[in-house]
């Protein structure tokens, strides 16, 4: 299993497109994966945008009612991935940014390196 961990705060303009591109990437490069998103106290429409994707993608959203910061969001996502794995020596986690700082088009190359 590959866990894509995405911390986000007020990423309404980009998070939907990112999830769509991740889906397209894994259609062309099939792997078992799960997307874990931390919505870190967003005050925009981030939560509303994430909701429909949870119905069509292997997506879990962790919502913080108030902002805790990037490091705590990453820690929470990695802990969630560790708690979910039943193959810790085989599974991996990749941290991505919701603003396309790390584009999904690089995922196949990253996964091949694992």
Could you describe each region identified by the protein language model?
Residues 1-114:
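Structured catalytic core of nucleotide-sugar glycosyltransferases
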């Amino acid at each position: 299993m590959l866990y894509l961990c995405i911390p986000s705060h007020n990423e309404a303009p980009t998070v939907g497109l990112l999830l769509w591109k991740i889906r397209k990437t894994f259609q062309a490069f099939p792997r078992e994966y799960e997307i874990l998103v931390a919505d870190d106290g967003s005050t925009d429409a981030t939560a509303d945008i994430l909701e429909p994707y949870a119905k069509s993608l292997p997506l879990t959203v962790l919502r913080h009612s108030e902002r805790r910061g990037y490091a705590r969001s990453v820690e929470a996502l990695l802990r969630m991935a560790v708690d979910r794995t039943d193959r810790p020596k085989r599974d991996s986690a990749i941290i991505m940014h919701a603003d396309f700082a790390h584009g999904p088009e690089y995922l196949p190359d990253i996964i091949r390196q694992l």
